[in-house]
Amino acid sequence: MKKTLIWCLAGFVIVALCCVGLSVNLHAQGDTAQQIKELQQQSRDAQMKNDASWAQQHLADGFVAGNSWGDWETKDDFIKDLQNKTNKWKSGNISEVQVATFGSNIAVSHYTFTYDAELRGTHRARTVICSDTWINDSGTWKTAATHCSMVKGK
């Protein structure tokens, strides 16, 4: 009887510890998702202000962007576009942000971005759907890749 009680108690402790571990992991994933949502908004805010410093800090080495008018851009190209004073943002709204986490170092956000801007001498007013891949680089979340496809607009 005593042996059975010890085994039951040991089993209960193991199950309890597993539940605590699962709870901590789910909480951490929730925190990561919220952090990525905030960074996603900061990214768009910086883009609207042509703030290249934010991009320099938060774009990973090897970053690549696929934009909705069919061009690929490297990190350097993307930063040069932000520094281009002829690019003017009239409006921009990010919505429907969703984040999926893959362990503690990778996350993918997808969202809708509606904007009106003068970019590279061309007026663009459109709604795009985008996905960004984020990596945790030694404690700092950085975008490794972004891609947007046009839903409607010109």
Question: Which residues fall in each region the model found?
Answer:
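Secreted/extracellular small peptides and ectodomain modules produced from precursors
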Residues: 6, 16-17, 128, 146
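N-terminal membrane-insertion alpha helix
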Residues: 23-25
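A beta-strand edge to alpha-helix "cap/lid" segment located at domain peripheries
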Residues: 27-57, 62-154
